[in-house]
Amino acid sequence: MARPVSDRTPAPLLLGGPAGTPPGGGALLGLRSLLQGTSKPKEPASCLLKEKERKAALPAATTPGPGLETAGPADAPAGAVVGGGSPRGRPGPVPAPGLLAPLLWERTLPFGDVEYVDLDAFLLEHGLPPSPPPPGGPSPEPSPARTPAPSPGPGSCGSASPRSSPGHAPARAALGTASGHRAGLTSRDTPSPVDPDTVEVLMTFEPDPADLALSSIPGHETFDPRRHRFSEEELKPQPIMKKARKIQVPEEQKDEKYWSRRYKNNEAAKRSRDARRLKENQISVRAAFLEKENALLRQEVVAVRQELSHYRAVLSRYQAQHGAL
């Protein structure tokens, strides 16, 4: 149904612009005049936000919708509606933009709250080997691998310092744990020296009780071939003593003095002979124990060498794949 001529809004009022303006800018000037005429006094606190929303709504208002068409000042019909006015030409309420929340790029992100994580400690917690140093160079001191904090955007204001961030204290604890791990690894790499006399080889050695009786001094502790140690003087070769030439003494000269001296010499020779035989028995029993222990240790050395060659092959493959340690 056609409207009366008096109810129609003249096109030059909305679409027409002042003299000298381009024909495409009439709709923009008419919409701006309508917005400025219907705007209410704004509060100072929300002035900046409303100004941004109005600037964002201007390009959307000039774009034709799916059911509207914009026409120039020459061919605009009498009942055309431009911008946000009423069909009769009266200024209506301006449609608010669809998104009232602040824009994503205008938000202030907490870039200062960045937690620092030690890379070696993280790998050790998850059962992974630490990162090897670069090959060919000296091993640098372990330094915590910190995540670089991104530079704050132009909209962020007064971001907190990394030192005052709440995640910095757990990071220090993680660094302390990692340093303690490295100290423990270093102490295990260089073990303390071991006294060879305190090492006992697990073996079964049961000497003959008769040999132990011949190797022990009567009235003293039983000889133990496992723990007995001979001195250097005892282990030296003993010289062969030549037997003294026998002197024939006539019967008439064999008095009490002669028999007393001969008795003492026989006792000394017997004591020397018993001591020599005792030492020989001890050395023989000790040598039997050492021979058996030596055979067992040789087998252990062969097993250790095989294990060492296996570990060296594993280490060489690791260095070929990941570089030198």
UniProtKB/Swiss-Prot annotation:
Residues 29-38, 57-80, 157-167 have a biased composition (Low complexity). PROSITE patterns: BZIP (PS50217). GO terms for biological process: liver development; positive regulation of transcription by RNA polymerase II; regulation of transcription by RNA polymerase II; rhythmic process. It comes from the Eukaryota. Gene3D superfamilies: 1.20.5.170. Ubiquitously expressed. Expressed in the suprachiasmatic nuclei (SCN) and in most peripheral tissues, with a strong circadian rhythmicity. Residues 255-318 form the bZIP domain. InterPro entries: bZIP, bZIP_sf, PAR_bZIP. GO terms for cellular component: chromatin; nucleus; RNA polymerase II transcription regulator complex. It is found in: Nucleus. Keywords: Activator, Biological rhythms, DNA-binding, Nucleus, Phosphoprotein, Transcription, Transcription regulation. Its main location: nucleus. Residues 257-279 are annotated as: Basic motif. Residues 283-297 are annotated as: Leucine-zipper. Residues 17-28 have a biased composition (Gly residues). GO terms for molecular function: DNA-binding transcription activator activity, RNA polymerase II-specific; DNA-binding transcription factor activity, RNA polymerase II-specific; RNA polymerase II cis-regulatory region sequence-specific DNA binding; RNA polymerase II transcription regulatory region sequence-specific DNA binding; sequence-specific double-stranded DNA binding. Residues 1-99, 127-200, 229-255 are annotated as: Disordered. Residues 129-153 have a biased composition (Pro residues). Belongs to the bZIP family. PAR subfamily. Binds DNA as a homodimer or a heterodimer. Can form a heterodimer with TEF. This transcriptional activator recognizes and binds to the sequence 5'-RTTAYGTAAY-3' found in the promoter of genes such as albumin, CYP2A4 and CYP2A5. It is not essential for circadian rhythm generation, but modulates important clock output genes. May be a direct target for regulation by the circadian pacemaker component clock. May affect circadian period and sleep regulation. This is D site-binding protein. It comes from Homo sapiens (Human). The lineage of its organism: Eukaryota, Metazoa, Chordata, Craniata, Vertebrata.
